[in-house]
Amino acid sequence: MEPQAEEFHHPYSPYDIQLQFMRALYSCIEKGKVAVFESPTGKLAGLSTGTLELLKRFQHKSSAHPRQDEDYGDEDIKILYCSRTHSQLTQFASELRRVNMPSSIPKDFSEGVADTDGLQEGVRHLSLGSRKNLCINPRVSSLDNVTAISERCLDMQQPGVAAEQRCPFLPSNENEAQVLQFRDHVLATVKDIEDIGKLGKDIGICPYYASRSVTKHSEIVTLPYPLLLQRSARDALDLSIKGHVVVIDEAHNLMDAISNIHSVTITLSELQTSLFQLTTYARKFKTRLKGKNRNYIAQVIRLVTSITDHLKTILETSQAPEGPVQPSDLMSGKGVDQINPYKLCRYLRESKLARKVDGYSEFSRERADRQADRKPSTPVLFHIQSFLLPLMNLSAEGKLFYIKAQGDIQLKYMLLDPMNQFREIVDDARAVILAGGTMSPMTDYIHHLFPYVPSSRLGTFSYGHVIPPENLIAQVLGKGVTGTEFDFTFETRDSERMVIPDGVVAFFPSYDYLSQVLSIWKRTLAGEKNRTVYDLIEGKKTILHESRDVTISTEELLQEYASIVGSGRGALLLSVVGGKLSEGINFSDRLGRGVLIVGLPFPNIRSAVWQAKIHYVEQKAYKESSGSDANRQLVAKAAGKDFYENSCMRAVNQCIGRAIRHRNDYAAIVLMDRRYDKPAIQGKLPAWIKQSMASSSALRPAGATIGSLSKFFVAQRTSKT
């Protein structure tokens, strides 16, 4: 039976679109589907209320009809809510606090209670985090590197460690009462990650390890991407996905996140440091090491030497600044061909060689650092090991690249296809929900993340905006005031005629292009004495811009921008697609009356990484297609083109989504490039944007577009007075 609006216990009266979203979410989870949801407003409240109502119904069914099968284990169904950052997880926790669920105590049992309507039921919620977020031991938390923190923590737990060197906050039989106290306090009210850390500090128990005992008692668990998307992280937290519901918010960058989490980069300098540490360790303990251990350490030294020598050759030659690397070239050193990669991988995992070598190196460094008053450096070999493991077992989905940078050279293992890494989650979970404000274009999720999921289990949902249609105008500006066509391709980006300042927040394809624009604006105009385009704009709006260099923090830049806008003077904020201001920051009301997207921010097709990605997509499409070779080639090329365009348009849609944050907000969206008028490009925009572009055309003169914008804002001012 479809839930009614009041059954979701939304903190406010939900709009019709929000109610549709919550009902569809409820239905998908109940039926065990894999679904992608796009909802530009009210998404967070919809996710919290929709999942809570479902939990309560599951619990009611479970208590009324205990299940006989054990398909999903002994635990009740949980909601595992995942997002990219802890700030987004904190926002979700805030939404949970606002939902008031009625008591599930039957009325028969509540007779005689004075105010049954006042009975409410809380949700058992747990925020999970990494050691970096939750460690309360100052000897460990003071380290500024995630790997160093993890290694120091594990070192303190090793057998034989002196009592004074062990962590006093680690849960044990002696402090079991504190662990139970921690559990009860965590489950009493909804707490975010900072609350969890403070609670552990107040009680005197490690919140990272104590949280494990809370997981099985929780109904909703929130956690960041790395803790959900890595099997090793889930195992470390004793977190099972089997039979539970996985909800991933802000999922527009999920595929990139999976690839990045399972990709590793090392540098030549790190390899050289690890080689020195390995040889020093081998010489120091050569008489104590067993023959088998000496042999494996010698193999690691030969392998690291071979990789180091090949990178030095690339660095010292006049090869391109970046390019692909063949595994056979890295393993061409003397004696490397005799190494059994599977046995060496097992040895690296089981022997904990990296921890031993890094531990000895750190002990040696600490004595020198104390004398020189230096901070301990990062454990290097542990990082090298994380690269060697995938190198020893390369899959078809991964590829190696080198990148020269500032006298050093990086070696990068890049996961090209996230499907298999995510499949275990999809197969184990009861239901998987991907949600975001702007998830368009959605074809990538279907083709590259869920191609194996039956269509009967798969669903996509895109909801409109809560604003009335007259509160948005979206225009393609394909020509300048002089009639020059806007075509911000790589080949035409140096043309000075392409730049027309307009709007409040402008997003440029890259930092380099933004620098070019600022340089052109600051040139003296022909026939003008010491007057520049920059001066003319400054006469109307104060110009602020994002910078690659950290000369000013994002918070300071936004505060200055908001202060100028709040003072009544206009401001033009120049930003970069994919930069600090393009995600997670909302420009509502006067802060975002206009959003300009300058050009299409396609990734650099000439980069080795993107050439490899597109080649992989094309090869996969070719293998999966049928018909003649010519037809399969066409299918492959179309798949590569679509994948490339989708990456660009996901970034564009994220920028567009920064504006219009509530029902009474209004804004103009201007897409400055004639290519936005192509049906293939417009088809990848969110539906609520496309609806506003029905009468737009890149062939219209700039004056006509500017006239439309002027009428739009006049109408808005009139309606608000």
Curated annotation (Swiss-Prot):
Catalytic activity: Couples ATP hydrolysis with the unwinding of duplex DNA at the replication fork by translocating in the 5'-3' direction. This creates two antiparallel DNA single strands (ssDNA). The leading ssDNA polymer is the template for DNA polymerase III holoenzyme which synthesizes a continuous strand; ATP + H2O = ADP + phosphate + H(+)
GO terms classed as biological process: establishment of sister chromatid cohesion; interstrand cross-link repair; mitotic G1 DNA damage checkpoint signaling; mitotic sister chromatid cohesion
Entry binding sites for [4Fe-4S] cluster: C135, C153, C167, C206
EC identifiers of the protein: 5.6.2.3
Annotated keywords: ATP-binding, Cell cycle, DNA-binding, Helicase, Hydrolase, Iron, Iron-sulfur, Isomerase, Metal-binding, Nucleotide-binding, Nucleus
GO cellular component, one term: chromatin
Requisite cofactors: [4Fe-4S] cluster
Top class in the EC scheme: isomerase
Helicase ATP-binding domain segment(s): 4-301
Binding, ATP: S39, P40, T41, G42, K43, L44, A45, G46
Pfam families reported in the protein's UniProt record: DEAD_2 (PF06733), Helicase_C_2 (PF13307)
Protein location: Nucleus
Origin superkingdom: Eukaryota
Gene Ontology molecular-function annotations: ATP binding; ATP hydrolysis activity; DNA binding; DNA helicase activity; iron-sulfur cluster binding; metal ion binding
Function in brief: ATP-dependent DNA helicase important for chromosome transmission and normal cell cycle progression in G(2)/M. May have a role in changing DNA topology to allow the loading of proteins involved in maintaining sister chromatid cohesion in the vicinity of the centromeres. Has a specific role in chromosome segregation during meiosis II.
Similarity section: Belongs to the DEAD box helicase family. DEAH subfamily. DDX11/CHL1 sub-subfamily.
Name the UniProt record assigns to this protein: ATP-dependent DNA helicase chl1
Lineage, top ranks: Eukaryota, Fungi, Dikarya, Ascomycota, Pezizomycotina
Gene: chl1
